[in-house]
Amino acid sequence: MMAGIALGFQVPTSAMPMLCVSAALAGLLLLGRRRTRAAGCLLLTFLLGAALGIRTANPTLPPEGDAQVTGVVAGEVDFREEKGQVRVILRDVTLNGERIASGAYWTFYLKADENIPDCLTPGARISMTAEVYHPQGQRNPHGYDFRQALRQKNILIGLYGAAKLQALPDGLSLYGLAARFNHRMAQTLRDVCGEKAGQLASAVLLGMRDEVPDEEQEQFRRLGIAHILSVSGFHVGVLVALLALLMMPVKHRRLRMALTLPMLLAYAFLTGGNAPAVRAVLLWALVCWGRIRHKRVLMPHVLCASAMIQLMFAPAQLFSASFQMTYGVMAAICGITAQTAPNAQKKRGWKGKILSLLSVSAAAQFGVLLPELYWFGRVPLLGIAVNVLLVAGMNVLLLLDWVTLLLTPIPWLAALPGAATRAVSEGFLHLVNVLGRFAPTLWTRQPDAWVVLGWLLVFAALLPFGKSRNRWQNRKKRLPMLAAGAALMATILLPAPFSGTEYMQLDMGDADAAVLRQEKHVLVVDAGEYGGDLASYLRAEHLPVDLLVLTHLHSDHAGGVRELLDEGIPIRRCVMPSGALEADFDEEVLPLLARMEENGTVIETVCRGDILQWAEGKLTVLFPPEGFSASNANDGSMALLVEAEGVKLLLTGDLSARYGQYAAVSADVVKAAHHGSKNGTTQAFLDESAPTAVLVSTKRENAADYLRGITDADVYSTLESGAIIIRMADGHFTIEQFEEMQ
């Protein structure tokens, strides 16, 4: 089914008739013998997955435009104070009176003197007029897929604006009930346990991971234990153990299981249908159901059944980090510990228990390794060593959290476990922060097919199959597989294979960022306002930055340096135009320059006539001249002529039109100044440079229209194309558009 869903996301809806015909043919196999029926079942499951993938990837969406909207606030209101942006998830949504099947992602902005409206509380039903839009998918290689992230939450549309916002009478809404309960429980945990302990408890009990500050989540990632912040089978297992303890007076085993099952389902509902919580509850619910029916419970069967059930209702979950981590960990623990368990059982007392804990910890770290590499691009070297200690600490903490939560209706009784929870939580977080700051990690690229194959070979070598009477002979047979798998996995420490010369203009909206690659050499020109996609690309390809060019110090060109530094991407050298620090630069850029210097980056200023040798190419600074001074940073923006493989690229930053004549030289490709605005790029400038192609980084439709009106050159807009990729060789170049490649 997983393979079918993955395929379904890649094929158009026109493939549906062919799937139906294939399913009919596969159904005929069910009439055959046992093996033929098994093959038919496998094929039908694959085709079902493909159909689910196609339907999820190509949903029917309401039209874009203004609409009268009603909905229920299904979670905490997220307020980004630095931008004045409010983000809300809505459920039970209607557009112009018509109910839609999915939720909505709603954003709007507050003015400097405005507060969040009083009607925006978790569980509240509201009404407003807003603009409906369809979320965009991935716009850059290895970039963030906003549309996919929303699909994983069963959200298909976005809403912008909050005109005529008003509260409506609360109706019967399960989402509203769950949101109000979640909010009340989270507030109670903070009141009883303190702010930090309450945030951590809300994350691990109620699925409110966003309650934990970003800097603390980063420390968990550095230690390779980010998965313990999401509700999982481990967290729900502690709840099951606690319920079993409370139900000890109930002697009948089937009755205990029958009482536990609805409690688990109620817990999944009260988390607001949080996907990780539902997944974990589903795992344990299947275990309880099997025991009620006196069936032998095999964890591999439970894992497969729970995965199939969840994917049938939410196919997009296949591509979520939490889904991959949960099933990676559980599969590895079930498989690998079955091999090591006999050895642990032979060791009596504390030695056997320690060996069992270490084997489970190692299996968990191995199971989560591929998702960690894909999503975070690093190998935590202390993972196995600290996993046993921190998971044991989390076990104790979860017990305290549950006891505190269950006793909150009696405040004086909850005070004692609340104080203990606060002390243990603060100690736990302090330990995580200390270990996280000093924990060594290996920076890696994104796993490719060879790395995945290596992981599968190692996993297969550790599985308990093919037992031999001679233990050494059995191990000897596995060693080549283990060595080959480890060797393939080690290739992830190398940069991604690449040859030739390539320039890529990233889609950054009304901001700028570009990457020029030649073999192993990397040049970055500006970093955008938010450098998440740029950092993701460099991390996924395992590329340190040889030279960073900041055309000027406005945040839409230099602000993204923050994400490069946060991701630990090395920047060896940085250049900016002479006089950049005398112009009206954005103050938030100064700390970023200081951080680069602290990390060992060499920062220089350049002016007209300076030539920067880079790889086999040449970079000539055309503007500003030495001693140039301007109050407007755009007036002093650097213009750069890049010559590589016999192709000339003219990069103009945000250079103002009145100074464009000083940078107007012949070029094959021109990157339009100031996002294609009239005060940046003029017809005279394009006539002088005479390019065959013009690139513009913008989110405005009229920018490309303006440029097409003043030049006969081909105009490529990031709004229309996503990332624009230019491949150069032997004096020729080709242009590819990421949107078309997708």
Predicted segment positions?
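N-terminal leader/targeting segments
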Residues: 1-63, 181, 279
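Residue-level signal for inorganic ion chemistry
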Residues: 4, 71, 322, 368, ...
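Hydrophobic alpha-helical transmembrane segments in multi-pass membrane proteins
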Residues: 39-41, 159, 214-384, 445-498, ...
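Membrane-interface helix/helix-cap signal primarily in integral membrane proteins
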Residues: 44-227, 535-536, 544, 581, ...
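Non-globular, low-confidence helical/coil segments that flank catalytic cores
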Residues: 72, 96-99, 114-131, 142, ...
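Aromatic-rich juxtamembrane segments at the membrane interface
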Residues: 152-283, 288-289, 573, 648-653, ...
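Hydrophobic alpha-helical segments of integral membrane proteins
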Residues: 174-193, 200, 208, 216, ...
